[in-house]
C-alpha cells in the first residue's frame, strides 16, 4: 500500500485544502474590486459583513433570490470558456430582483467541483467580479467545495444568491396592471440561461452539430452563440421614471407562457403578438432541428424577449425611447393567462 504523506490523507482522497487556500488567496485582490465602503471585515471570514446605507428610503424592503446556470455549464466546460457562465449567474439573479423594483446590494457564489482547477476558478472569479462591478453589487462571500465523489472529472456546478433593496411604496407587484396597458419587450441576445438541456439534445445529439462549427444563419460559431452572456436589465429599468412601470417579468425557464402570468391580476390576460419582433436564428434552428411545436418553444425558451415591462399607453413612448424595446402586446380582460397571437 502506498504510504500517504503525513497530513495529506485528505488530498489523496481528492480534496486538496492547501491548493484551495492558495488559489483563493491569490484572487482576493480581484474580489476586493467589487467592494464599496459598505463592505466590512476581511475576505474569508465566517460571514460577509455589509453596512447597508438606506438613506432616502423610508421603509426599506430586502429582496433575495437564488439561482443556478443549469446545463449551459456543459457548453462552457466543453469549450474551456468559464467566465461567461459566472456573468450569466450574476446577471440572472440581478434581473430576478429587478422585477420587484429592487437594486442589488451584494452577491454570494457557490462553486462545487470534482476538484479545484486553478485556471477554471480564475475564469469564474473573473466573470463574477466583472458582472458584480457592472451591476454595482459587492461579491461579499462564497463557498468552494471539492467533491470528487459527486462530480465527474472536469465537472462543476454554480449557484448564486443575491440580496437587494427597494422602498416598500415602490415595489412592483403587478397590482396596478389594467386592461389596455401595453407589453414592452426588451430583447435577449440568445438563450440566456435556460433551455440548454433541450438545445443540446437537438443541436448536438440529434443534428450532430459541432460547437466550433459555423452554422448558416448564426453570427458566431455554434458554441459562442450558446455562450452569449445573459443580459442585465436592471440599469435600464432603474432609469425609467418612478411609477411608469406597473409590472415586470424576467423571461427565463417557463418562457412567456409561464412567466407573464406571475405578474397578471386575476382579471387580466396578456395578449402577445409574436410577429412584433424578430425571433433570433438560434431559436429557429432548435425548433426546426427538433421538430418542436410553437407552443412548447414559447414555454421553454425566451424566444428573443428577455424582460417584459407593463406600462400604460400614456407612458409607452417614453419607455420605448429609454429602453430600445418593442411593443409586443397588450393587457386584456381575462383570467390571468397568456394568449399568443
Describe these PLM feature segments.
Residues 20, 56-57, 69-72, 167-170, ...:
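Short, acidic Gly/Pro/Ser/Thr-rich loop/turn segments
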Residues 29-30, 35-189:
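Glycine-rich phosphate/pyrophosphate-binding loop regions near the starts of catalytic domains
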Residues 2-38:
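N-terminal amphipathic/basic leader segments beginning at the initiator methionine
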Amino acid at each position: 500500500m502506498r504510504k500517504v504523506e503525513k497530513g495529506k490523507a485528505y488530498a489523496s482522497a481528492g480534496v486538496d485544502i492547501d491548493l484551495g487556500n492558495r488559489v483563493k488567496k491569490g484572487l482576493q485582490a480581484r474580489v476586493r474590486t467589487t467592494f464599496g465602503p459598505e463592505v466590512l471585515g476581511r475576505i474569508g471570514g465566517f460571514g460577509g459583513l455589509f453596512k447597508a446605507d438606506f438613506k432616502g428610503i423610508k421603509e426599506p424592503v430586502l429582496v433575495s433570490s437564488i439561482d443556478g446556470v443549469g446545463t449551459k455549464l456543459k457548453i462552457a466546460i466543453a469549450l474551456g470558456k468559464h467566465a461567461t457562465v459566472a456573468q450569466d449567474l450574476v446577471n440572472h439573479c440581478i434581473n430576478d430582483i429587478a422585477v420587484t423594483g429592487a437594486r442589488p446590494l451584494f452577491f454570494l457564489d457557490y462553486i462545487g467541483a470534482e476538484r479545484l482547477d486553478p485556471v477554471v476558478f480564475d475564469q469564474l472569479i473573473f466573470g463574477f467580479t466583472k458582472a458584480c462591478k457592472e451591476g454595482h453589487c459587492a461579491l461579499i462571500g462564497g463557498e468552494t467545495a471539492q467533491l470528487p465523489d459527486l462530480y465527474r472529472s472536469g465537472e462543476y456546478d454554480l449557484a448564486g444568491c443575491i440580496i437587494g433593496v427597494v422602498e416598500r411604496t415602490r415595489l412592483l407587484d403587478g397590482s396596478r396592471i389594467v386592461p389596455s396597458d401595453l407589453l414592452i419587450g426588451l430583447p435577449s441576445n440568445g438563450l440566456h440561461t435556460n433551455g440548454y438541456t433541450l438545445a443540446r439534445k437537438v443541436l448536438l445529439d440529434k443534428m450532430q452539430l459541432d460547437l466550433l462549427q459555423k452554422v448558416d444563419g448564426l453570427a458566431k460559431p455554434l458554441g459562442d452563440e450558446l455562450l452569449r452572456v445573459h443580459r442585465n436589465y436592471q440599469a435600464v429599468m432603474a432609469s425609467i421614471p418612478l411609477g411608469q412601470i406597473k409590472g415586470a417579468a424576467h423571461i427565463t425557464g417557463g418562457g412567456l407562457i409561464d412567466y407573464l402570468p406571475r405578474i397578471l391580476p386575476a382579471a387580466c390576460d396578456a395578449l402577445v403578438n409574436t410577429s412584433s419582433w424578430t425571433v433570433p436564428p438560434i431559436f429557429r434552428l432548435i425548433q426546426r432541428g427538433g421538430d418542436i411545436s410553437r407552443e412548447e418553444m414559447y414555454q421553454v425558451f425566451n424566444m428573443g424577449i428577455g424582460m417584459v415591462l407593463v406600462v400604460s399607453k400614456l407612458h409607452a413612448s417614453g419607455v420605448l425611447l429609454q429602453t430600445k424595446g418593442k411593443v409586443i402586446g397588450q393587457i386584456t380582460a381575462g383570467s390571468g393567462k397568456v394568449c399568443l397571437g
